[in-house]
Amino acid sequence: MKKWLCIICGLIYDEAQGWPSDGIAPGTAWEDVPDDWLCPDCLVGKADFEMIDITDDAPIEEVTAVSSVSVGSAVQPNTAQPLPSEVTQPAFSNDPIVIIGSGHSGYQLAVALRSQSATVPITVFTADDGALYSKPALSNALAMNKGGDALQSESALEWESRLNIRVYPHTRVEQIDRANLTLHTSIGKYAYSRLVLATGASPIEIPIEGDRSYVMSVNDLVDYRRFRTQLQDKKRIAILGDGLIGCEFANDLIESGYEVTVIGLGKWPMERLIPHQLGESLQSALTDRGVEWALQDSIARVDAMSESSAVLHLNSGKQIEADLVLSAVGLKPNVSLAELAGLEVGRGIKVNQFGQTSDENIYSLGDCVETDQGWQPYIAPINQMIPSVAKSLLDDITPISLTPTPVIVKTPLLPLTIFPVAPNAQGQWYIEHQGDDLTAGFYSPEGVMLGFALLGRQVQSLRAPWLEQLSFKQTAA
């Protein structure tokens, strides 16, 4: 049986399991899945899936668990070392490959490693419960009437058993002893042969005075469960942040029957990602559905007004009443553990063309990573990096190759696809009407297209030809 990966959101269709909730029985081959079937999480079609695995359904060879060991005291370098220009691999010890983080990148790397080696010992440390879920689905799960249990696909124990690895949930890694290849964790010391930092990214918190108990973020399944609980008996939701995630949540909440106000610093929604005309069109579509806007503004203070509602004091002096504030102002890579270990860090943990950090034994993967093309927060480049990193960890040295992949913004009221322009890129937008839809390309002064945005239902079919126009150099690892 085969497994198919949605390159947009990371959902996996397993032929052995099918998708019974959509009437697709277990054992249904991909070619027999209806052509009009859509990804349950991001609503793209079958064309945006690619095969990632072929299994014969035979159990893998049992792996002998590696026990935690205690070694000498940690010795950390005083400064970060530069990235190696070429990968160097020390000989394997009997200690496991250790992955810190059980999000999409950490889990998928464990899957890739196990698919290539039935015997290599693999250990995963995670600060949460280690449950598997699709993070991109968090911002559109309400409209699909999915609670936390519906989003969870497996518990840590289930995927630990299925992959024949070791998972330590609710365990924090406090320090990396690079000299002795040892982790200091909340449950003791643990040796590794090679280490992968898949520590993810956390919500940015802006300073807000007053009662912050009304303010929350949704960045993982635990957050989402709490969010669903907080939404009970609530009606008026203020979203702080007018970017991609803020707009997705606005669409999701308004379609679920809530009153929504979006507060953001931009002159138009998603100002950093799309040009003015497209932003205005997106704003109009959401406004027509009932979303209200307070742009070029932010929250200065929150004061409780009753047991279940608050008044938001904006920087402009405007006041808004709300029952809950969802903060969606952006993410910051989790780099503190890498910094403490003396690894080279910029906006994210810096890696070379093999996913290797400035320590030859330590790799990094996911939205904590910064390549020579910048921070990589989107799921498509993460998916493209995983196979190469897995091979390099197993001594099959393989450079990462990133190909252009769009970002599908989950705003079904007005579909939007973008290929983000790199920060500080020089150039300008050129916009064209395609009937009621809009297309926009961002071109350098030399006429090279560096990014694009497609707004509207009909132009979504144009993603492939627009991707072909992108500069390969812009997207190479």
Language model feature labels by segment:
Residues 4-22, 81-165, 252-273:
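Beta1-alpha1 glycine-rich phosphate/pyrophosphate-binding loop at the start
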Residues 130, 139, 236, 245-301, ...:
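Rossmann-like dinucleotide-binding cores of NAD(P)H-dependent redox enzymes
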Residues 15-16, 48-51:
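Short, non-ligating residues that shape and space the ligands of small metal-coordination modules
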Residues 213-232, 311-313, 318-388:
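FAD-site-proximal beta/loop scaffold in flavoenzymes
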Residues 40-45, 52-94, 98, 157-236, ...:
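FAD-binding core/adjacent interface of flavoenzyme oxidoreductases
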Residues 103-107, 129, 201-203, 222, ...:
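Residue-level detector of alpha-helix initiation sites
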Residues 21-36:
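Short linker/helix segments within small regulatory modules
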Residues 74, 79, 87, 92-96, ...:
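Mid-to-C-terminal Rossmann-like scaffold of FAD/NAD(P)H-dependent oxidoreductases
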